[in-house]
Amino acid sequence: MTEVVPSSALSEVSLRLLCHDDIDTVKHLCGDWFPIEYPDSWYRDITSNKKFFSLAATYRGAIVGMIVAEIKNRTKIHKEDGDILASNFSVDTQVAYILSLGVVKEFRKHGIGSLLLESLKDHISTTAQDHCKAIYLHVLTTNNTAINFYENRDFKQHHYLPYYYSIRGVLKDGFTYVLYINGGHPPWTILDYIQHLGSALASLSPCSIPHRVYRQAHSLLCSFLPWSGISSKSGIEYSRTM
């Protein structure tokens, strides 16, 4: 596709689910977008198996972008990402795993990738409601374009995965990126507990607890966190590695 794409292209984009007739087109697009070769069974699954959310963005009838994701129970998360959610979440808590998100080169920077990602979020909110606590994906450590895209949409690096990919016989490193939704969060670290306690103490009036105890606790926490004023903490920011 080499046509000049107008700035108003997004207004002409339609969304629809992938179907079996799209297999050849999807194979061609994935060959252009990704260095990984997928088996034929993968293409059959994402275009017919209802466990996948497979959405195409079309422009004047042609597929110009797509997103494929699987919404599954946290018990089905692979071992390397098993700590995406804290252990206190129930076993029927769900996560959404993005297998693929791509846009035809000429149509990039027109908001189509964002539209597809937002459509996944909308789908989760209507089907999984608040049971889905995280959206995650894997990306090559060298894919700066994709990394910037996800980081600009509040995904956080959760894990570094050495030798995660095998591309044409060469092992490549990957990252796991996660977006927490509906109150989802990773396991807390010691620092998280300290920050949370600091926030709670800072919200108390010294008159409500013995003044000496308050001052000692406040000084102790400041010694752990010399770079930040505890009184300014209003919450916890989670960040890990993909």
UniProtKB/Swiss-Prot annotation:
Mutation effect (C132S): Does not affect localization to the Golgi apparatus
Q: Where is the N-acetyltransferase domain?
A: 13-182
Q: What is the effect of changing C30S?
A: Does not affect localization to the Golgi apparatus
The chain's Cytoplasmic topological domains, given as residue ranges, are: 1-192, 237-242
* Pfam families membership: Acetyltransf_1
- Would you tell me the Gene Ontology cellular component terms? Golgi membrane
Question: Gene3D superfamilies recorded for this chain?
Answer: 3.40.630.30
Q: Where is the site described as Required to position thioacetyl group found in this chain?
A: F34
Entry EC number(s): 2.3.1.259, 2.3.1.48
Residues recorded as binding substrate, renumbered to this chain, are: Y38, L99, Y165
Q: Does the keyword Membrane apply?
A: yes
Q: How does it sit in the membrane?
A: Peripheral membrane protein
One of the record's GO molecular function terms: protein homodimerization activity
Q: Top-level EC class, please?
A: transferase
Tell me, what is an example of a GO biological process annotation in this record? chromosome segregation
Provide the disease association from the record: Basal ganglia calcification, idiopathic, 9, autosomal recessive: A form of basal ganglia calcification, a genetically heterogeneous condition characterized by symmetric calcification in the basal ganglia and other brain regions. Affected individuals can either be asymptomatic or show a wide spectrum of neuropsychiatric symptoms, including parkinsonism, dystonia, tremor, ataxia, dementia, psychosis, seizures, and chronic headache. Serum levels of calcium, phosphate, alkaline phosphatase and parathyroid hormone are normal.
Q: How does it assemble?
A: Monomer and homodimer; monomer in presence of substrate and homodimer in its absence.
Listed name of the protein: N-alpha-acetyltransferase 60
Source organism per entry reads Homo sapiens (Human)
Name the lineage.
Answer: Eukaryota, Metazoa, Chordata, Craniata, Vertebrata
